[in-house]
């Protein structure tokens, strides 16, 4: 019997908070205008988004090129096809792909059938794997403003991208 990698989704809720120093001041509505300052090219700039959804789309766009997270010896980037977003009566969603892999150690790839080495991986090569990420943001209702969304991370066996993705989001936001 062949062993197969366990494919799964792990779900998390998320919110955006306005911070004053080190303390969260308030939770922000996800479907309201978002304005914040961010350093870019050594200069502080003001960014305005119509909602958290658009902020996340901008995060994906800003991470299309491969980023070398040298401290963690990890490569990271995203891809997104605008056809992988949409909305239903009660929520909006988008699906994007995160590519991540570690480098920093040499190893070899061995063909399991022939038992022969097919490639010798150098310390500068990373085994980059694709993972799907799904973001769901509820729409506001007459009696309630959405303050929490849902984010689903695909996992393949022991591999996943939650930590590298959320750290990149924290750096971006």
Language model segments and positions:
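A short alpha->loop->secondary-structure connector
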Residues: 159-173
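Generic detector of ordered, mature protein regions
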Residues: 107-109, 151, 164-166
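Intrinsically disordered, low-complexity polar/charged tails and linkers
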Residues: 1-140, 147, 155
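A generic structural motif
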Residues: 150, 154-161
């Amino acid at each position: 019997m062949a062993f197969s990698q366990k494919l799964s989704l792990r779900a998390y809720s998320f919110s955006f908070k306005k911070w004053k120093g080190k303390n969260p001041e308030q939770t922000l509505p996800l479907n309201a205008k978002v304005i914040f300052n961010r350093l870019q090219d050594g200069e502080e700039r003001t960014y305005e988004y119509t909602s958290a959804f658009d902020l996340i789309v901008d995060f994906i766009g800003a991470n299309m090129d491969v980023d070398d997270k040298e401290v963690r010896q990890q490569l990271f980037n995203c891809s997104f096809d605008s056809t992988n977003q949409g909305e239903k009566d009660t929520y909006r969603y988008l699906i994007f792909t995160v590519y991540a892999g570690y480098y920093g150690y040499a190893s070899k790839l061995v063909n399991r059938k022939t038992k022969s080495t097919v490639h010798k991986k150098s310390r500068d090569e990373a085994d980059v794997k694709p993972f799907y990420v799904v973001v769901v943001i509820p729409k506001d209702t007459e009696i309630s403003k959405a303050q929490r969304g849902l984010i689903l991370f695909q996992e393949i066996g022991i591999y996943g991208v939650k930590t590298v993705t959320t750290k990149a989001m924290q750096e971006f936001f």
